[in-house]
A protein has these predicted regions:
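Flavin (primarily FAD) cofactor-binding/catalytic cores of flavoenzymes
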Residues: 1-81, 143-269, 273-522
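Conserved N-terminal glycine-rich FAD pyrophosphate-binding loop of Rossmann-like flavoproteins
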Residues: 79-117, 300-320
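Flavin (FAD/FMN) cofactor-binding and adjacent substrate-gating region
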Residues: 100-143, 325-329, 333-341
Length: 522
């Protein structure tokens, strides 16, 4: 049996329990059925497995069900209770509760592959009063010239996904647990190894044997800035120096009880949201909160490499309606990126990338007032070090163009949102080592235009991936609502070519849309 890419164990493995992974399996890049059986791991046959269980899994399953694949042929392996659970957690801690609006456009509807009726149309129909009904329609009709881009409320997105989840019988396909690894099966197919919850199975692991696997694990992990991590670890202070993507409600509650100074780091959408929360609390409760905002790069106006790749800016911020220019989802940038390889693709990603935030009149008015009244100040520089200061404060030392600058603050909220390397995710790292997967030009998981993970095909079996782990591929907007749907369409188009699901032609699409409109279960 061929065993390419055997990886030596750095540390001894714990003794294998009943139905657990043993050294033979851990060290083998391809498994036989006999190897798995000898380890006492039960094997379950299922044609299509998706794991992660977030919105990426949800929209892919939605496409498959609409294309006629029965629930019995699909399994969703996930620790999540709902597909939007992780996403809602991240939005909530980064100050986007259900009543606030997301950074997504009207037609990016994960519950509706057709995009119509859009969120704006639905909001208009459900609103009370003529003014409230006309507002979303007028907004999308005049954006972005006479109004800011329309964006849906987070709660509307989650509620509509719940409705579609029930319509496609999503929960019938869900198996609870944490995926440990995916390995190629000798002779074709894959084994996806699941660790079920305690007490849910008589064995430690279960192996799902399938022809198709889809990976949608979301972000590989959160990466903290070195100075932030050093301070937290050295001084065991995880409450005053926080990342915006972790639970930090205590910061706002403390400031509601006494005056304080907060340092904000970062210039993206999360920084905008954190500032809004601080200023809303200040206005609503009459607080005396002082805000220091540190920009590493201060934007004073329009900027970019050429007149065709320019972005508005001002007061430190780079402005853009969405994560990427809208043409990446269906215009010239999507077409251009699809043709590029290697360094050329990486260069275009760099040109399109960079931290940015949408223009919202309410935010700009808040910050303008803060600058005029003196309680919101900006600093251009980088953090040199942080140490405990007097009276329970943090002494922050900055490097600026004018020289060193230091001062004491009560809290530091880091809003840079750095993402960890894919090798820090156990399953993705295992794919790199054992499955033949590689990295794309910017270091993420390398996928084909069909979102098949390059180098992992096993005879007629295919392994796909979508979401942020694949950023850097032939399609840029992968970690967005619409991007996940476009990836799901590409994947299911490819599956239709090999006969796993039906084509989505005009007749079937129209019939299925009509079923969606009437909320008819499929």
């Amino acid at each position: 049996m061929p065993q390419p890419g055997i990886r030596p164990q750095i540390a001894p493995n714990p003794p294998a329990g009943p139905g657990d992974l043993n050294n033979d399996l851990l060290n083998s890049s391809q498994w036989t059925d006999q190897q798995v059986a000898a380890a006492g791991i039960p094997i379950i046959d299922i044609p299509f497995v998706t794991f992660g269980g977030g919105i990426g899994s949800f929209v892919t399953v939605d496409y498959l069900r609409i294309r006629g694949v029965p629930p019995e042929a699909i399994r969703v392996l996930t620790p999540l209770n709902t597909p939007w659970e992780s996403y809602e957690y991240l939005t909530r801690v980064s100050q986007i509760p259900r009543q606030e609006r997301l950074r997504s456009d009207s037609a990016s509807t994960p519950d509706n592959i057709w995009g119509f009726p859009s969120y704006a149309v639905r909001e208009a129909f459900s609103a009370k009063g003529i003014k409230n009904k006309l507002f979303p329609l007028w907004n999308v009709a005049t954006e972005p010239i006479f109004s800011n881009y329309y964006t849906p409320k987070a709660g509307a997105a989650f509620e509509s996904m719940e409705k579609e989840m029930n319509r496609i019988r999503y929960n019938e396909m869900v198996v609870r647990g944490q995926v440990r690894m995916v390995r190629k099966r000798f002779g074709g197919g894959y084994f996806t190894v699941l660790t079920p919850p305690d007490g849910a199975s008589r064995t430690r692991r279960i192996a799902y044997r399938s022809r198709f696997v889809h990976i949608a694990v979301g972000y590989a992990g959160l990466k903290f800035l070195p100075d932030l991590e050093e301070y937290r670890t050295k001084y065991n202070d995880f409450s005053r120096v926080v990342n915006a993507y972790e639970q930090h409600e205590h910061v706002y509650q403390t400031l509601q009880g006494r005056p304080g100074t907060v340092m904000i780091r970062g210039g993206g959408i999360v920084a905008s949201r954190v500032l809004q929360r601080l200023i809303d609390d200040r206005d609503r409760l009459g607080l005396q909160t002082q805000i220091l905002h540190v920009f590493r790069t201060y934007i004073t106006g329009s900027h970019g490499d050429s007149i065709f790749m320019r972005r508005k800016g001002g007061d430190g911020w780079a402005y853009q309606g969405f994560n990427y220019p809208k043409s990446v989802w269906g215009g010239q940038l999507k077409s251009q990126m699809r043709k590029l390889e290697g360094e050329q693709r990486a260069a275009l990603y760099k040109a399109m990338g960079g931290t940015n935030t949408p223009v919202r009149n309410s935010w700009q008015a808040q910050l303008r007032r803060g600058r005029n009244e003196g309680w919101y100040r900006t600093i251009v520089g980088t953090m040199d070090s942080m140490t405990p200061g007097a009276n329970g404060t943090i002494r922050a030392q900055l490097k600026t163009a004018q020289g060193p600058l230091d001062g004491n603050v009560d809290f530091v909220i880091d809003c840079t949102g750095l993402e960890a390397d894919i090798s820090e995710h156990r399953v993705l790292d295992d794919l790199l080592v054992h499955a033949g997967a590689g990295r794309n030009p910017i270091g993420r998981l390398d996928v084909e235009r069909t979102f098949e993970v390059r180098g992992t095909r096993n005879f007629d079996a295919r392994l796909y991936a979508s979401g942020s782990a694949t950023l850097g591929g032939y399609f840029p907007g992968v970690d967005t609502f619409l991007g996940l749907q476009i990836a799901a369409q590409e994947i299911t188009d490819d599956l239709a070519k090999v006969g796993f699901c039906g084509p989505l032609g005009v007749a079937r699409s129209t019939a299925q849309w009509w079923r969606w409109v009437r909320n008819r279960q499929i």
